[in-house]
Amino acid sequence: MKRFLGALVLLAVATASRAQQSPSPASAPPPVRQSFLVLLREQADLSGAAAIPDRLERRRFVFDALNDVADRTQAPLVEELRASGARVRRHFLLNMLEMEADDAAAASIARRPEVSRVASNRPAAMGLVPDALDPGVASAGGRAPLAATTVGENLDIIRAPQVWARGFTGQGIVVGHADTGFAWEHPALKPHYRGFDGSTVSHAYNWHDAVHDAAAGNPCGSDSAFPCDDDSDGHGTSTAGILVGDDGLGAQPGVAPSASLIGCRNMDQGTGTPARYTECFEFLLAPTDAAGQNPRPDLGADVINNSWTCPVSEGCTDPDILRTIVANVRDAGIFVVVSAGNAGDACATITDAPAIYDIAFCVGATDNSDAIAPFSSRGPITVDGSNRLKPDLVAPGVLIPTSVPPDQYTFSFTGTSASAPHVSGAVALLWSAIPPLRGDVDQTEDLLRRSAVPLLSSQDCGPYPGNAVPNAVFGYGRLDVVNALVFWDPLPPRQLVLPHRSRPALKVIAPRTP
């Protein structure tokens, strides 16, 4: 009994000692600040956009409607937050504020009647498949000058050169690049960067950096005033190369070499946040000057490539945020292409935003023999209970030749990150070839699906048997840009032959009407 009593006495003494040594409230450490997203209840009504036939007028309507609501409803809340010491950044694409505050302040804001909810904005690490599929691939790939007359087999597979031969190379189309940045002075990219006119450069309205708090050691730092790729493997430079790359001397990794490239860095060495992704979508909808002011939706992108994912487990805890953003961008007539992800060969492995959304065009990866890449994520989408079909289609994504910083090329860029820019570039080709289609996202998506080369699989996933088209492995099939042009052509039917080295030619009859 004495032993227990002694222990109680010691505990009481120790507790008293700790109480005497505890800091006073005045010397207590300040509350830990975190990044939060404050979503307001009132959101813009964009239902009138679909009835506006003119592409630029529709975009202006969307931009004005979004900003009218944000300007009217955010001001009182911003004033109060800043008065309390919170750091605040305003967003308009979704009526939302980004704030840095402690938990108590966040809880207080969440109770306000005009606030719908407060969500986390913690960093999200982007999933990338390694370049090497096996130990021999990396050494076979590497970095080197691209051969003087190189056009990759991947471009032959989607039949881009035949579209170029018809005079359609993406001219007049603006391609938006949301990624780790890009090395704008790379010889395959510099001629196609909209900020370079052949002699002088202006990054205003052509480049934006959404990374304002880069981690130590980031080679681009924060708020880079010029396009810079902070990924050690040059991820953004590689995806940009597949979009538009062409050095004018024969090295041409790009699908749409005459398209204009603008860009926004939305990741800090592969780590993004919902707010960074939002900010880049905003810039690509309505680019700003070098100070981030005076937005101009008339200078925005036609198509936005997104070779990244934002997993729920790593930051995208509120799926409605990015979905609403993608929906609003789409309402403005901008085509949004996303990678399916690299989660492997099981069914229902497309699990991350934005690939899971019905309104985002999701792309899986094939190799050069039209076999599905083992890493390419499959559908259907089960994480939201919809069981919807994804991917929409597939494109080459294994051992793709493209650009890497500062001025070299790789022959081994691999992943659905490589597949998505094939489709983004194809949209640029189609919209340069078919001006009435430009800005018509619904009809363009339908055209791409109907004209894809149908591919079958032995893998059944949910309600989608692999021996039917569409299926949850290949979607509607593999991208073919010539097919898309022919399927659009309203002239009498023409027989379409889709040759491929790995199998007999597949014959399809193109319909009379798109």
Regions found by a protein language model. Give the residues of each.
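Hydrophobic h-region of N-terminal signal peptides that target proteins for export
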Residues: 8-18
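Inhibitory N-terminal propeptides of secreted protease zymogens
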Residues: 21-136
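Subtilisin-like serine protease catalytic core
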Residues: 30-33, 50, 117, 151, ...
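Structural recognition of the beta-strand scaffold that forms the well-ordered cores
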Residues: 36-39, 89-90, 96-100, 117-119, ...
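C-terminal subdomain of the subtilisin-like protease fold in secreted/lumenal serine endopeptidases
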Residues: 87, 152, 294-305, 360, ...
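Protease zymogen maturation seam
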Residues: 111-174, 187-190, 374, 379
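Catalytic-core segments of hydrolase enzymes
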Residues: 239, 281, 293, 297-403, ...
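Hydrolase catalytic cores
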Residues: 240-243, 262-270, 332, 397-469
